[in-house]
Each structure stands twice: as C-alpha cells, then as structure tokens.
Amino acid sequence: MAKNILLLNGPNLNLLGSREPEVYGATTLADVERAASEQVAQAGAKLTTFQSNHEGALIDRIQAAKKEGIDAIVINPGGLTHTSVSLRDALAAVAIPFVEIHVSNIHQREAFRHHSYLSGIAVGVICGLGTEGYAAAISFALKKL
C-alpha cells in the first residue's frame, strides 16, 4: 500500500515568498506544495496539504488524519511551535509519526523562538535549511516512517 503523507503549515506560512524574504526566502507556499506533490508522486505515495492560520483548524485536521490512515505528518507549525500545548497534545493523541520543520533556524533567532512544544515528541526536527527543508522532511517520511 502506498504511503499517505500529510503536509501541514501553520500561521503566516501562507505568506511565504512575501513575508520577510530575507528570513524565509522568495519561495511561496504554492511552490513548496507543488514540489512536495511532485516528490511524493515520484515515490508512488499520496500527499495531502493543509494550511491554516487557526490553531483549532490545525488540531481538527490532525485528528481527522488518524481516521484517514495518514502514515506520517510533516508539519511547520509556525509561531504555534512556541506556544501551543494543544497542538502538541493533538499530535500525541493521534500517534502518527511526524517531522517538525522550520524554514529559518529558530535557534539563531529571538530567544522566545528557541523552545518548541513539539520537538520532544517529533521523530525529527529540521530547521534552517530554507524551503529545502520540506524536501528533506518528506524524503525522510517516505523512507523511514
């Protein structure tokens, strides 16, 4: 059976390509999703994408993933990384292995960005590779999860 991967993007990631391009680059979320779809299709797997600026919508999507038979999640939680116990609890509750990704290196930024509520339960964390980090996370999910 083909792998089924869910790519989740949190608040403000819909602004990739225009928001602080010196930090996040010029690649748009549509570009990221298109490249991810091609990468997953080449592996004979399925990709579902979802972006929301709302914590509850992301939690609802994570909970739905369990019923859909999602095998792995790649998530860029954006600013919710540093604030959302509820997002962590949702990921823990569904017990779907996930990779946390950040376009920028959160450890080189403001002190409040250094802590992640998700990394302690993630299979892996990728940060600072720009949007290329998505491809690395998806590659890992396809091969290892």
Swiss-Prot record:
The UniProt record lists the keyword Lyase: yes
Keyword annotations of the record: Amino-acid biosynthesis, Aromatic amino acid biosynthesis, Lyase
InterPro entries named among the record's database cross-references: DHquinase_II, DHquinase_II_CS, DHquinase_II_sf
CDD domains: DHQase_II (cd00466)
GO BP annotations, alphabetical order: amino acid biosynthetic process; aromatic amino acid family biosynthetic process; chorismate biosynthetic process; quinate catabolic process
Annotated EC: 4.2.1.10
GO MF annotation list: 3-dehydroquinate dehydratase activity
Pathway: Metabolic intermediate biosynthesis; chorismate biosynthesis; chorismate from D-erythrose 4-phosphate and phosphoenolpyruvate: step 3/7
Enzyme class (EC, first level): lyase
Binding of substrate, residues: 76, 82, 89, 103-104, 113
Catalytic activity as recorded in UniProt: 3-dehydroquinate = 3-dehydroshikimate + H2O
Gene3D superfamilies, per the entry: Dehydroquinase, class II
Presence of the UniProt keyword Lyase in the record: yes
Protein family (similarity comment): Belongs to the type-II 3-dehydroquinase family.
Subunit structure: Homododecamer.
Protein name in UniProt: 3-dehydroquinate dehydratase
Source organism: Janthinobacterium sp. (strain Marseille) (Minibacterium massiliensis)
Upper lineage: Bacteria, Pseudomonadati, Pseudomonadota, Betaproteobacteria, Burkholderiales
